[in-house]
């Protein structure tokens, strides 16, 4: 929602770091951060085109970006201490990682929609009010 993309990136990284201070840092967090930064960049470029209908599509695309990158990180580095799953470092191992992660995608997409629609509604309401003053 910031006009400056660097401020968007900074806000995202600071919020994630604060959260990770409480939750704990983890080995493949670079993939989570990278996916969120990419999603921020993509949506920064298209933010003027967001409406109620397109948000569903953008939410799906953002969830898919997160799914692909974060699960690649799980395949590449494993998930030590969480599930202790080590995938074979070949195409079959990567495919197995993505297949086993499919049940989590639904929750990612659903939570994206649950939070995105109110956030966009509030943002649009505030920008309409401030522009009418």
Can you annotate each of these PLM segments?
Residues 1-2, 21-22, 68-69:
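Transmembrane helix irregularities
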Residues 130-133:
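Membrane-interfacial, low-structure loops and terminal tails that flank and connect transmembrane helices
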Residues 51-128:
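Membrane-embedded alpha-helical hairpins and interfacial helices in multi-pass inner-membrane proteins
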Residues 1-4, 41-50, 122-127:
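Structural signal for the C-terminal ends of transmembrane alpha-helices
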Residues 2, 30-38, 110, 114:
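Membrane-embedded alpha-helical segments of multi-pass membrane proteins
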Residues 4-12, 16, 52-63:
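Transmembrane alpha-helical segments and their boundary/interface "anchor" motifs
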Residues 7, 11-45:
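Interfacial aromatic-anchored transmembrane helix boundaries in multi-pass membrane proteins
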């Amino acid at each position: 929602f910031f006009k400056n993309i660097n401020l968007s990136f900074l806000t995202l990284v600071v919020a994630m770091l604060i959260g990770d201070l409480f939750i704990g840092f983890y080995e493949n967090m670079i993939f989570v951060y990278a996916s969120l930064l990419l999603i921020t960049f993509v949506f920064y470029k298209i933010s003027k085109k967001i409406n109620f209908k397109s948000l569903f599509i953008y939410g799906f695309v953002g969830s898919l970006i997160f799914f692909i990158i974060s699960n690649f990180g799980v395949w590449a580095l494993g998930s030590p201490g969480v599930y202790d799953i080590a995938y074979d470092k070949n195409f079959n191992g990567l495919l197995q990682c993505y297949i086993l992660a499919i049940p989590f995608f639904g929750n990612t997409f659903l939570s994206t929609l649950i939070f995105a629609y109110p956030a966009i509604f509030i943002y649009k309401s505030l920008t309409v009010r401030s522009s009418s003053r």
